[in-house]
Curated annotation (Swiss-Prot):
Binding site for DNA: H90, R109, K150
Cofactors required: Zn(2+)
Gene3D superfamilies linked: 1.10.8.50, MutM-like, N-terminal
CDD domains noted in UniProt: EcFpg-like_N (cd08966)
Protein name as annotated: Formamidopyrimidine-DNA glycosylase
Described purpose of this protein according to its UniProt entry: Involved in base excision repair of DNA damaged by oxidation or by mutagenic agents. Acts as a DNA glycosylase that recognizes and removes damaged bases. Has a preference for oxidized purines, such as 7,8-dihydro-8-oxoguanine (8-oxoG). Has AP (apurinic/apyrimidinic) lyase activity and introduces nicks in the DNA strand. Cleaves the DNA backbone by beta-delta elimination to generate a single-strand break at the site of the removed base with both 3'- and 5'-phosphates.
Keyword Cell cycle: no
Higher taxonomy: Bacteria, Pseudomonadati, Pseudomonadota, Gammaproteobacteria, Enterobacterales
Catalytic residue positions: P2, E3, K57, R259
Keywords in alphabetical order: DNA damage, DNA repair, DNA-binding, Glycosidase, Hydrolase, Lyase, Metal-binding, Multifunctional enzyme, Zinc, Zinc-finger
Length: 269
């Protein structure tokens, strides 16, 4: 599933082509996504794009009279293409722009979303989200406060959007490795020093992935059709049985809350 770096990469890629241009119309080929494509999107016509923002894993397209909320789901990606390029099997939504470009949404598994809202504040998909991990609100003191009485393993807790948004399976595994923290550790067992370190490395790992265009394991593509190159730098995720890049110990795979977790038994305590 695209996580924060992939969504932010998409935002940065599409923003220059959308802001200042006008949506001439939308072409919805298959509206049966995780939730049905909002009726307002079908009727879009002559709507200038004022901004392209991100909250958690949601892309937010600001129009004069409302917002388009886009979620990439498990396998979605957004590309900027010439208007005349024919659509393929899994290309479900196009926004046809006044500059001759098309914003094309591709999603083989159709688990994403295209929603419309007049007001962002209070919308059900955005209402109960934690802080952005790259903001000043997310720091060691905040993390320690939220972990202090939490009797659950730190790995699934990091993936809870009420704690912090956008840190999915890949980046939780990678951040815990970078901090030297075992994913089975109870959140409440983390010291102040460990919380400070973990908050810092989460920011560093996410920023590095954004620099590399995110992580492509299967479906994700940047807006120009290129893969995300952070996959080449993964330290533990997807490397079961391979030697740890630090100590040589084979990487272990386990399940936490039905999600695969990867770690090094030697480097993470």
């Amino acid at each position: 599933m695209p996580e924060l770096p992939e969504v932010e990469t998409s935002r940065r890629g599409i923003e220059p082509h959308l802001v200042g241009a006008t949506i001439l119309h939308a072409n919805v080929r298959n509206g049966r996504l995780r939730w049905p494509v909002s009726e307002e999107i079908y009727r879009l016509s002559d709507k200038p794009v004022l901004s392209v923002q991100r909250r958690a894993k949601y892309l937010l397209l600001e129009l004069p009279d409302g917002w388009i909320i886009i979620h990439l789901g498990m396998s979605g990606s957004l590309r900027i293409l010439p208007e005349e390029l024919p659509a393929e099997k899994h290309d479900h939504v196009d926004l046809v722009m006044s500059n001759g470009k098309v914003l094309r949404y591709t999603d083989p598994r159709r688990f994403g979303a295209w929603l419309w809202t007049k007001e962002l504040e209070g919308h059900n998909v955005l209402a109960h989200l934690g802080p952005e991990p790259l903001s000043d609100d997310f720091n060691g003191a905040y993390l320690q406060q939220k972990c202090a009485k939490k009797k659950t393993a730190i790995k699934p807790w990091l993936m809870d959007n009420k704690l912090v948004v956008g840190v999915g399976n890949i980046y939780a595994s990678e951040s815990l490795f970078a901090a030297g923290i075992h994913p089975d550790r109870l959140a409440s067992s983390l010291s102040q020093v460990e919380c400070e370190l973990l908050a810092r490395v989460i920011k560093a790992v996410l920023l590095r992935s954004i620099e590399q265009g995110g992580t492509t394991l299967k479906d994700f593509l940047q807006s120009d059709g290129k893969p995300g190159y952070f996959a080449q730098e993964l330290q533990v995720y997807g490397r079961k049985g391979e030697p740890c890049r630090v100590c040589g110990t084979p990487i272990v795979a386990a399940k936490h809350a039905q999600r695969a977790t990867f770690y090094c038994r030697q480097c993470q305590k």
